[in-house]
Amino acid sequence: MKGSNDNSSRRLGVGFIGSGFNARFHMLGWKGVREGDVLGVWSPNKKNAASAAEYARSLDVGNAKAYASITDMVADPAIDAIWLTGPNQARIENVEEIVHAIESGKGSLVGIACEKPLARNVAEAKRVVELVKRVGLQQGYLENQVFSPQVEAGKELLWARGAATTGRPYLARAAEEHSGPHMPWFWQGALQGGGVLNDMMCHSALVVRHLLTKPGQPLATVTPKRVTAHIASLKWSRPDYAKRLSKSMGKDVDYTKSPSEDFASTTIEFETDDGQTVIGEASTSWSFVGAGLRLSAELLGPEYSMSWNTLDSGLKLFFSREVRGKAGEDLVEKQNAEVGLMPVVANEAVAYGYEAEDRHFCRVFLGKEKPKLTFDDGLEVVKILMTAYQSAEQGKTLEFPPRGLDKFVPAVAKGTWKPR
């Protein structure tokens, strides 16, 4: 596609930075993307890169191959855009290599999409934005939940029928909850940039703002004014569970000495463009034990409401205690049981919004749509997250944005936070 003036029938060649759980979820969602192909994977772990490329080929979503370096992938004329899905701590390094490859004339791209969060703190997020804008790339901020078909349909219908006749919605709630992430780096505050607030509140904080924003209007029409947050380590710093965690994730994860928060709640007061106050309540947890991952949202107005819960999937299976089998995640992500009455999320990549967001950003980079979310939106999310950490640390409500936000690093990320 590079250099083409007619993108109407062209397909976007996409390369992935990252080969883990998130990258594979995107690849699974790619089965519903007609505008692009997964053609490349780079990871510092060559074996994992090769495995992820093989996985993409097995799904028939592109003739993917593993690359020896990010520069090699950018230099390949078949690669038009990069999807950044690697660990948070590698974000700056990865983007710098992309930009250097472009500026040195080794390759070119039309766009770059970045998985949430954009970066670990405001300073790093601003650096990512500056680098990408310096080389004139189109941007896509990958926040799958706002692309969930249930979220989109619920929002559109409530605004069209309820808000149009009785007034705009005034309260939105969103939550993501499960029993903990797959990889050790997520649990290490210094690497990840925090705990569950940084890892998953980025979803919920944006979902509530998205729901409160009138369809077709920019997020800026609903402006954050005040933030109140709480964080806690409810489960994983308990001695028995800290020991289990260290055993499963390795000696570098020790929640008796350097815990991260496994629960966070945030209330965001917004002001609308017509001067009304509306509220967003966001919560997130690594200490939720249910059937598996639970995403939920609500939107409430004067005479209407909506609710969404991914575990209300419509399909349930029952297994008696006589059924024996290996532990797995074949019923639902972050699955916690294999017996009893269990919900099944039949197509998680669709239900959670991966398919729709990847299709959208392929179309954006082909010039067929305007981006719903850019890196500027990702930066705004990071600002809200860092304000939430400040509020939790200070134990009070803060005006948004607070002073010193650009230089702020959470105590969890410094390794100095102690649960109360």
Predicted features, each with a name:
Residues 111-184, 202-205:
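A contiguous active-site-proximal alpha/beta segment in oxidoreductase catalytic domains
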Residues 85, 283-284, 298-301:
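Short, well-ordered coil/turn residues at beta-beta hairpins
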